[in-house]
Every structure is written in structure tokens, then in C-alpha cells.
Regions:
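N-terminal alpha/beta PP-like core and its mobile active-site loop of ThDP/TPP-dependent enzymes
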Residues: 2-339, 388, 469-472
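Phosphate/pyrophosphate-binding active-site segments
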Residues: 2-19, 23, 167-171, 182-184, ...
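Active-site diphosphate/adenylate-binding microenvironment
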Residues: 23-24, 32-34, 41-44, 49-54, ...
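Small/polar loops that bind or transfer phosphate-bearing groups
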Residues: 41, 64, 88-89, 144, ...
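Short acidic/His/Gly/Ser-rich catalytic and metal-binding motifs that mark active-site loops
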Residues: 49, 177-181, 252-255, 355-358, ...
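A general structural motif
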Residues: 65, 123-126, 192-206, 262-265, ...
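Active-site flanking residues adjacent to catalytic metal/cofactor-binding acidic residues
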Residues: 116, 283, 307-308, 394, ...
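Thiamine diphosphate
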Residues: 122-123, 313-314, 322, 329-330, ...
Length: 562
């Protein structure tokens, strides 16, 4: 479980503690007010901040590598929707968190990273210009000083929420223990511009949808952030439309008419139905190359309208309407009458359990051509074995092609991908720890590859410490599978793409977990037995999967790139 220190009782006429009455303490007090948890790793630059918080019993989870400080906070936000907070020391500590900070920026995660920084007198031999480094990743840095410590910390949280982006709050080393001074005036934060719905756009889109024979609605994370999924489902139900989501909004509609995740993770029989749509309304999703299967998700004849309140990235052939999402969808709902008959009447099988389960064309043999387990068969079996009330967290790597396709989740905040925006691996253990803190009542399931697992291995211990009940599934092909299928298949030498076999179950046991190695589907029974008898603890399942089975999204990518 997450460790927090015990609050020290106050004593009469006690000497002032070193973490009281200074800039770091003021920042800490605002963090305690604005965030529900702090994720970090202590060093010279943030020790006073952390001490102030842990002394008072504020929830704090320590990472073992700074990369996990931000990935924990990132995943905490994705699992709860609340703003998150992380902290590192200056220099090397900040640099270690840079990849996960860039991921948070590209994934549009509102969090505040409180970082120690160089003193105001200038860079020391072991400092870097952290503000410039953050700017290179598109992240704004604010600086806490004696005259603005409280106000600027509030500003950092406000800015993160308004822009849906990470913000760095720097505490210069020589100011951390400085006493507060006369408050400096702080200009009000400019209001975020509104994008009201144009009535002409509403009338036109409502007419297009009402006139469609096979309407489909695709929702992304933007629809979740706008709290627009309920009215959007209302629009779909009136039209008799089918639904799809982005991976970050999985199961947002909670509807039997949901075809699942759009893009490279779409099941083949569901894809066949989706491609029949004649009008598609895309709400709060980017329609990037992965979502559109490199432009093949829908045929060219499909009319696509994309609604979002962010600038148009210019991807795909969709007509773009910039508008605040929820008001726009509520306006549509008022304009669309109930339709009959509908597309749903012509495809009743979509709502049936048989359609939502494995399709005969996807039925997988137990083993791949090399005699190791077929990952499709493994993950399909795990969907039946793992508790239904689960959070599924994924690291990055070739293996991501199977978990989103075969593992169901109870709500859109239970499918967590950290690393995909920046195309990074190694963030799994930290992300899973953040999810365990955010949703302790659920079983946290981390699905990782062996390459990413080894990269982030230091924070397996963090995951064990932060998790009430969890399962680590390592889909272990003894390789960097993505590179193997993209480049070795073209004749490049594979030596650097291969990894000597590692027994992650043994590593987990050494750190206090239970676990086993699986070479057959029958070996998954050990996990099933453990789940039946344990309400707490972590189980590490190392699955020896085939190097010869290629994920569908990877095959699409290779084909698109030629």
C-alpha cells in the first residue's frame, strides 16, 4: 500500500520546524489543497516540499526512478479525471522525468510537476536550463518565489486544467527555504475562449445524420472531458446509430451497439460492419493515422464530420467543426427526431453476446509456428480469468495489439495507455502504480512486454507497494517485437532486436509478489487459483509468447509504410 509518514504532534512553544514558513512549505500547502495525492522522488531540490506534506500525513507515493513520478501522476489523472501532481529534484532528477513529461504533453494530461531548480544566482556545474528543456517539449514553466509562492502554485493548477496540459512549477534551490515576502501582484489568467455552436452547423449536421441510412458515432477522450457522452449516446439512440470509441474512451457509451475501439484494435467482424457506415460523426477524437488504420477505417465514400474545441490537426478527410463539445451535442439532440426503422434494425446481431465475443475468423490456435504461445489465445483466455472489476494498464510495444482487442473494461477510465503519444516504452510499472492509487477497489492489471518491463523494472517495487490487488502480465517474446516485425522482416540484422529470456515471475517473487511462468494455456490456471484465494497481493504472470504472430495493427502499419 502507499506509504505515508505519521504526522508529528504539535507541542507548546516548539521550535519552528525546518519545513515551515518558507517557499517550499507554502507551495506544499497549496498542493495539498489542490491535489489528492503527490507522486515523487526525493532529492535536494524538493526535500522540504515532501517533508512538509508527509509530516502532515498527506498521501505520497515514492517512485524508484523519476520517470515514474510523472507517469504515476499521468495515469492517476486518466483513471480519475482529477488534476495530478508530481515532484522531482533539480538537474538529473528533472532530466530523468523528461520522457514522461513529454508523453503527458503530447497526450494532453493536466498535471503539475513541482521541480527543484537551479538557484537564482545561476547554473551550477550539475544544472541544466530546465525551463528551456520544458519549452522544447511544449511545457510551460512557472517559478515560485517568496512573493508569489501561493498564488503561482494555484496558477499552475489552474493553467494545467484550463489548457489540459502539464505545467512545471520550479522552486529555485536558494529560494526553497526563503521566508515569504510581500505578495507580488499576479495578472488574472485569461479566460479560455468559448467556441459556441453555430446554429447553421447544427442544422446541417442534424440533417446529414437524420438523412443517413447507416450513421455511426465515434467518441474520443475529448467527449469524456466535456462530459458529453450521455447526450451523445442520446443522439445515437434517436438515430439508431452504431458507436465506436478511441482507445482512451473505451466503453464510454456502455451500449450493446458499441463496435468497440476504432483503428488498429478493431476486431475484424466489427470492422466489416463499421465500414458500411455512410455518415460518421466524430466527437473529441483526433482521427490520427492509428485511429483511421492509415486511412482505411472507412471507405472514401463515407461522409465524416469531426467536432472538437481544439485546433484542427488537419488529419484525414473529415469536415471539421470547431465548437465546444457538450453544447454542440446538446444542440444536436434537440434537432434530431427519433428514427424508425434504423440501421440497428438491419444488424440486430451487433447487440448480441455472440457478436461481442470472439469471431470464428479470430479463433487462435494455442501455439504459434515457433511452439510458443499465441498471444491472441492467451489474452482471450485472460479476459475470462481476470476479475471483471479491473483497470487495465498497458506499457508500449508490439504486444499492445491484443489487450485492447480482447480485454474488456468496465468504463473508459479503466483502459490506460501511457507512452503511446510519445511512442515510448518502459512506463508500465509507474503507470500501473498510479492507477492502483487512483482505483484501489479494483484489481490493477498491467500488461507489458519484456522490453518495456526491463526498461522500467525499478518501479515494479513501486507497483507492489502501491497496489492492494494486482496482476502483472508480461507477454514475453524475448524480443523488441515491434522492430522485429518492421525491420528484421525486411532483412535487417536482428541481433539488437532480441532479448535473452528473462523470468519476470522470478523477479517478482524476489520482490515479494507471487508468480509463475506460462508455456501453455493450462498454465494460466495458476493465476486463476491465486485470484480465487487472494484478495490482496500481486501476481506476476510471465507468458512465453510467439515471435511469429503479428498484431493486426502492426500488419496494417507495415503495409501502409511499404
Amino acid at each position: 500500500m502507499t506509504s505515508t509518514s505519521t504526522e508529528v504532534p504539535a507541542t507548546g512553544n516548539a521550535t519552528k520546524l525546518p519545513d515551515e514558513g518558507n517557499v517550499a512549505a507554502i507551495v506544499a500547502d497549496v498542493v495539498a489543497e489542490r491535489a489528492g495525492h503527490l507522486f515523487g522522488l526525493m532529492g535536494n531540490g524538493n526535500v522540504h516540499l515532501i517533508s512538509r506534506l508527509t509530516r502532515r500525513g498527506f498521501p505520497f507515493t515514492s517512485a524508484r526512478h523519476e520517470a515514474a513520478t510523472v507517469s504515476m501522476a499521468d495515469a492517476y489523472h486518466r483513471a480519475t479525471g482529477g488534476v495530478a501532481a508530481a515532484t522531482t529534484t533539480y538537474g538529473a532528477g528533472f532530466a530523468n522525468a523528461y520522457t514522461t513529461l513529454a508523453e503527458a504533453r503530447m497526450a494532453r494530461i493536466p498535471l503539475v510537476l513541482v521541480a527543484g531548480d537551479a538557484p537564482t544566482t545561476g547554473l551550477r556545474p550539475f544544472d541544466i536550463d530546465q525551463a528551456k528543456a520544458a519549452k522544447a517539449a511544449g511545457v510551460v514553466t512557472l517559478v515560485a518565489r517568496p512573493g508569489n509562492a501561493a498564488a503561482i502554485t494555484h496558477r499552475a493548477f489552474d493553467l494545467a486544467l484550463q489548457t489540459v496540459q502539464p505545467v512545471v512549477l520550479a522552486i529555485p534551490y536558494d529560494l526553497a527555504t526563503a521566508p515569504p515576502s510581500v505578495p507580488e501582484p499576479l495578472e488574472p489568467l485569461p479566460a479560455k475562449p468559448a467556441w459556441p455552436a453555430d446554429p447553421d452547423d447544427l442544422d446541417r449536421v442534424a440533417g446529414l445524420l437524420a438523412g443517413a441510412e447507416r450513421p455511426l458515432i465515434l467518441a474520443g477522450r475529448g467527449a469524456l472531458l466535456a462530459r458529453a457522452t450521455e447526450p451523445l449516446r442520446g443522439v445515437g439512440d434517436r438515430l439508431g446509430a452504431l458507436f465506436m470509441t478511441s482507445v482512451m474512451a473505451a466503453n464510454a457509451f456502455d451500449s450493446p451497439w458499441d463496435l468497440g475501439i476504432a483503428g488498429g484494435f478493431t476486431r475484424s467482424h466489427r470492422l466489416d460492419v463499421a465500414r458500411q457506415a455512410d455518415v460518421v460523426l466524430v466527437v473529441g477524437a483526433s482521427l490520427n493515422t492509428f485511429q483511421t488504420r492509415y486511412g482505411t477505417l472507412f471507405p472514401p465514400s463515407t461522409r465524416i464530420i469531426r467536432v472538437d474545441n481544439e485546433p484542427d490537426p488537419g488529419l484525414g478527410a473529415a469536415e471539421y467543426i470547431r465548437a465546444d463539445i457538450r453544447p454542440f451535442i446538446e444542440g444536436l439532440l434537440k434537432r434530431i427526431p427519433a428514427a424508425a426503422p434504423t440501421w440497428r434494425d438491419r444488424v440486430p446481431e451487433v447487440s448480441q453476446a455472440e457478436f461481442r465475443s470472439s469471431h470464428p475468423s479470430e479463433d487462435a490456435a494455442e501455439f504459434g509456428p515457433d511452439g510458443r504461445l499465441n498471444p491472441r489465445a492467451v489474452v482471450a483466455a485472460l479476459d475470462r480469468i481476470l476479475p471483471a472489476e479491473r483497470s487495465v494498464v498497458m506499457d508500449g510495444g508490439h504486444f499492445i495489439g491484443w489487450a485492447p482487442m480482447y480485454l474488456s473494461v468496465p468504463d473508459p477510465h479503466a483502459m490506460i495507455f501511457v507512452g503511446t503519444a510519445f511512442q515510448s516504452i518502459g512506463m508500465g510499472f509507474g503507470s500501473a502504480a498510479g492507477v492502483s492509487v487512483a482505483r484501489p477497489e479494483r484489481t490493477t492489471v498491467l500488461v507489458s512486454g519484456d522490453g518495456g518491463g526491463l526498461m522500467g523494472l525499478a518501479d515494479l517495487e513501486t507497483f507492489l507497494r502501491a497496489t492492494r490487488r494486482g496482476v502483472v502480465v508480461v507477454l514475453n517474446d524475448s524480443a523488441y517485437g515491434a522492430e522485429l516485425h518492421q525491420y528484421a522482416a525486411k532483412g535487417l540484422h536482428d541481433q539488437a532486436m532480441l532479448i535473452d529470456e528473462v523470468d519476470f515471475a522470478a523477479v517478482g517473487r524476489a520482490l515479494g509478489a507471487e508468480g509463475s511462468k506460462a508455456h501453455t494455456l493450462a498454465d494460466l490456471g495458476r493465476l486463476q487459483e491465486w485470484l480465487a484465494t487472494h484478495e490482496e497481493g500481486v501476481y506476476v504472470l510471465d507468458v512465453a509468447i510467439s515471435q511469429k504472430v503479428v498484431a493486426e495493427y502492426m500488419a496494417e502499419s507495415v503495409a501502409a509504410k511499404g
